[in-house]
């Protein structure tokens, strides 16, 4: 990574604002998945070990630019304190004199500021709000890859006002994605799932420019199958994108691999009657909700030959057990492959976790949307704003 790193900063005695991604699920006042908190710990510990005074800021959920008790950071503070093994002082604000006072009083541990999205200036990247956030600090570190595709005050505005650098997690995310996109060990197999071709058109184009094989599952495969002239029953199809799908298939030839069989049902619900049929025989009124066993085997063969794998998106309606087997089959194959594997997107990551395969993946991305935009070749505002290393 060519950006200035936290390693390049003189930290002793400095007040450092760290943008973390603590947008974690909370139920009944408890954090139910602390992965994102754990992934931020190396940067936090590094800063503390080098004598910095550290305050952390994150968004949580989607509050509408004003305080909402459901999205307070208190449960996150409690879990962070347990994981870090140091005191975490949670403030009920992100700005104002209280922040400066807390930094002056800080002897051990870290400060966690209140939810950045309690302020309307956050999502607008309001200059006055960014200046207020930056005021008490000497340095800024961005370790929130999952929010790097947002041009918000805590990802861009503050970085424009303070000497800024990337944290270890942001570095790691970019290094893995750069490795996949710029110098993959071959064969390079990309796997894409999810519902809509329209959401991933740029990603598909980008991956077809570098991957040896692109395996397409999830509901988006039905737009491709219909574009090939097949009947797809009541399956989800984006008719406006049939022309694009045809163009992509013609350009990719045999590098774009589609399902050969699918699991269909009359309704998308637990307990619905299901059938497994070849893609040429999807019944009228039935919808495809997962890839079938022959497709799992076909995808598996390609995956086991790979030396580099990028996987984003489920192969079916993963939340319903009857339509989860395709995603689980792909997860097991990726784990078995021994390839350098980068996995992103909520359902792909959930499948890996459910099967206990996290340790078998090279890198599990904390940012589904950010990783897709990066793969697509789009600039991530939270990364672009950081100075290049040679500028230091």
From Swiss-Prot:
This protein's record includes keyword Transferase: yes
GO biological process: gluconeogenesis; glycolytic process
Pathway listed: Carbohydrate degradation; glycolysis; pyruvate from D-glyceraldehyde 3-phosphate: step 2/5
Ligand binding (substrate): 21-23, 36, 59-62, 117, 150
Residues that bind ATP: 200, 288, 319, 345-348
Catalytic activity: (2R)-3-phosphoglycerate + ATP = (2R)-3-phospho-glyceroyl phosphate + ADP
Pfam families: PGK
Entries under PROSITE patterns matching the protein: PGLYCERATE_KINASE
Superkingdom as given in the UniProt entry: Bacteria
Secretion signal span: none
Keyword terms: ATP-binding, Cytoplasm, Glycolysis, Kinase, Nucleotide-binding, Transferase
Cellular-component GO terms for this entry: cytosol
EC code: 2.7.2.3
Enzyme superclass (EC): transferase
Keyword presence, Transmembrane helix: no
Family classification: Belongs to the phosphoglycerate kinase family.
Subunit structure: Monomer.
The name this protein goes by in its record: Phosphoglycerate kinase
Organism the protein comes from: Rubrobacter xylanophilus (strain DSM 9941 / JCM 11954 / NBRC 16129 / PRD-1)
Gene from which the chain derives: pgk
């Amino acid at each position: 990574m060519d950006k200035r790193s936290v390693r390049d900063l003189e930290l002793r005695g400095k007040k450092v604002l760290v943008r973390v991604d603590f947008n974690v699920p909370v139920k009944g006042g408890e954090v139910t998945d602390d992965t994102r908190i754990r992934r931020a710990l190396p940067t936090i510990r590094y800063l503390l070990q080098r004598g910095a005074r550290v305050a952390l800021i994150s968004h949580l959920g989607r509050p509408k630019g004003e305080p909402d008790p459901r999205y307070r950071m208190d449960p996150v503070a409690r879990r962070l304190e347990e994981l870090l093994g140091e005191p975490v002082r949670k403030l009920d604000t992100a700005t104002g004199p209280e922040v400066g006072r807390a930094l002056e009083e800080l002897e051990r541990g870290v400060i966690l500021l209140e939810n950045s999205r309690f302020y309307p200036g956050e999502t607008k990247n309001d200059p006055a709000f960014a200046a207020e956030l930056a005021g008490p600090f000497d340095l800024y570190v961005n370790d929130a890859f999952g929010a790097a595709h947002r041009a918000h005050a805590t990802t861009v505005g503050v970085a424009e006002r303070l000497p800024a650098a990337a944290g270890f997690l942001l570095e790691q995310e970019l290094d893995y994605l750069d490795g996949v996109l710029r110098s993959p060990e071959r064969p390079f197999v990309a796997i894409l799932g999810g519902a809509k071709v329209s959401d991933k058109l740029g990603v598909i184009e980008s991956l077809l420019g570098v991957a040896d094989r692109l395996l397409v599952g999830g509901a988006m495969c039905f737009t491709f199958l219909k574009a090939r002239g097949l009947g797809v029953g009541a399956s989800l199809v984006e008719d406006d994108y049939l022309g694009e799908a045809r163009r992509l298939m013609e350009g990719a030839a045999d590098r774009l691999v589609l399902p050969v069989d699918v699991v269909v049902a009359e309704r998308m619900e637990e307990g619905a009657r299901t059938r497994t049929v070849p893609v040429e025989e999807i019944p009228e009124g039935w919808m495809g909700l997962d890839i079938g066993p022959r497709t799992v085997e076909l995808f598996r063969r390609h995956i086991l030959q790979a030396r580099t794998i990028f996987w984003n998106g489920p192969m079916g309606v993963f939340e319903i057990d009857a339509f989860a087997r395709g995603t689980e089959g792909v997860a097991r194959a990726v784990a078995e492959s021994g390839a350098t594997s980068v996995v992103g997107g909520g359902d792909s990551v959930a499948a890996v976790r459910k099967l206990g395969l996290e340790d078998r993946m090279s890198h599990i991305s904390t940012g589904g949307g950010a990783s897709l935009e990066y793969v697509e070749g789009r600039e991530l505002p939270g990364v672009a704003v950081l100075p290049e290393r040679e500028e230091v």
